[in-house]
Amino acid sequence: MGSTSRVRGTGVNRHLLSTEDLDRDDALLVLDTAERMARVAEASVRKLPTLRGRTVVNLFFEDSTRTRTSFEVAAKRLSADVINFSARGSSVSKGESLKDTAQTLEAMGADAVVCRHAASGAPHRLASWVRGSVVNAGDGTHEHPTQALLDAFTMRRRLGRIDGLAVTIVGDVLHSRVARSNVWLLATLGATVTVVAPPTLVPLGISSWPVEVSYNLDAVLPKSDVVMMLRVQRERMSAAFFPTEREYSRRYGLDADRAEMLPDHALVMHPGPMVRGMEIASRVADSARSTVVEQVANGVSVRMAVLYLLLGGSGEVS
C-alpha cells in the first residue's frame, strides 16, 4: 500500500482514501482500536484528551447529516477542535475551486480534513494539496471507506469474525461507493462477497472485483451470513435502470418472506438512509437480526479510531 494512504505510520502524508489501499494488518488495527473506542463510549465520561489542540475540518460538498455528525462526535470525543465547512452558502458556491479551499484550510492549520464530494477522486486531489491528513467521507460513486470499516466492525461484533463469512450485497451496486469500499475491505479480511443486482445496476468492470455476481436474490439468501441492502440512488441516475419501483422491490427487495430464507444467525445491514418498502420492509429493518441502529453507534467508534491513528493521538486507549 502506498504511503499516502497508510492509516498507520509516522509520515506526514497519512490519509484514508480507499479501502483498496488497506492491507489486512491496517484494517485489523482500525477494528481493534475501534473496539477500545467503543468501551470509551460506554463509560460514564465519554471523552479522551488524545487529540487536544488538534483541528479537524469537516469539508462537505454534499449534504450528509448522518456522516458529518458522526465524524463531529468522534472528533469531539477525542477532544479535537471541530470546524464544520459546508459548501452551501460558502465561497465554494461562489466559484472557489477545491484547490483554493485547500489553501484556505492550510492557512487555518487544519490537522485533518474529512472530505465528502460529488466528484470521484476529489479527496485524492485534496490530499496532494494539504499537509494534514485527509479522510474520504464519500466521493461520488467511488468509495466511502469509513462506512465499510464500520460495517466490518459491526459484523465482527455480532458474529465474532469476518474471515470465512458469506456476505451478500444487494441493490444499486453501480452507483454505490459503499458497495465498492465494502467489497475491497471484506475481501482483504477473508470474506466471500456476492453482489446481487439488476443487470443495469452492475458496474461494467465488475469482473476485476473480488466478487461473485448473481441476479437471483432468492438463490443466494439461504447461503448468506450477512445481507447488506443498498439504497437505490435516484439522484445519481440519468436513465431508466429498472421498469418500476414495484418491479425492483418484487425482485430485489428484502421483505419478511425473503428474510425467512436467511440462516438463523444471519444479519441484515443497511448503510442508510433506507427507503422502507422498496429495498427493505420495515418489519425486516426493525427485526432482531437488523444491525441498522448498531451501525450508527459503531460509526462513531470507528471514526474515532481512524482519527486517533491518523493523527497519532497521545496516550494509550485502554
From Swiss-Prot:
NCBIfam families the UniProt entry points to: asp_carb_tr, PRK00856.1
One BP term from GO: amino acid metabolic process
One Pfam family cited in the UniProt record for this chain: OTCace_N
Residue stretches in coiled coil: none
Residues the record lists as binding carbamoyl phosphate: R66, T67, R116, H144, Q147, G272, P273
Domain of life: Bacteria
Catalytic activity, EC: 2.1.3.2
Pathway recorded for this protein: Pyrimidine metabolism; UMP biosynthesis via de novo pathway; (S)-dihydroorotate from bicarbonate: step 2/3
Keyword vocabulary terms for this entry: Pyrimidine biosynthesis, Transferase
Binding-site residues, L-aspartate: K94, R177, R231
The protein's name: Aspartate carbamoyltransferase catalytic subunit
Residues annotated as signal peptide: none
Reaction it catalyzes: carbamoyl phosphate + L-aspartate = N-carbamoyl-L-aspartate + phosphate + H(+)
GO CC terms, sorted: cytosol
Homology family: Belongs to the aspartate/ornithine carbamoyltransferase superfamily. ATCase family.
Subunit structure: Heterododecamer (2C3:3R2) of six catalytic PyrB chains organized as two trimers (C3), and six regulatory PyrI chains organized as three dimers (R2).
Chain's role: Catalyzes the condensation of carbamoyl phosphate and aspartate to form carbamoyl aspartate and inorganic phosphate, the committed step in the de novo pyrimidine nucleotide biosynthesis pathway.
Encoding gene per record: pyrB
Organism name: Frankia casuarinae (strain DSM 45818 / CECT 9043 / HFP020203 / CcI3)
GO molecular function, one term: amino acid binding
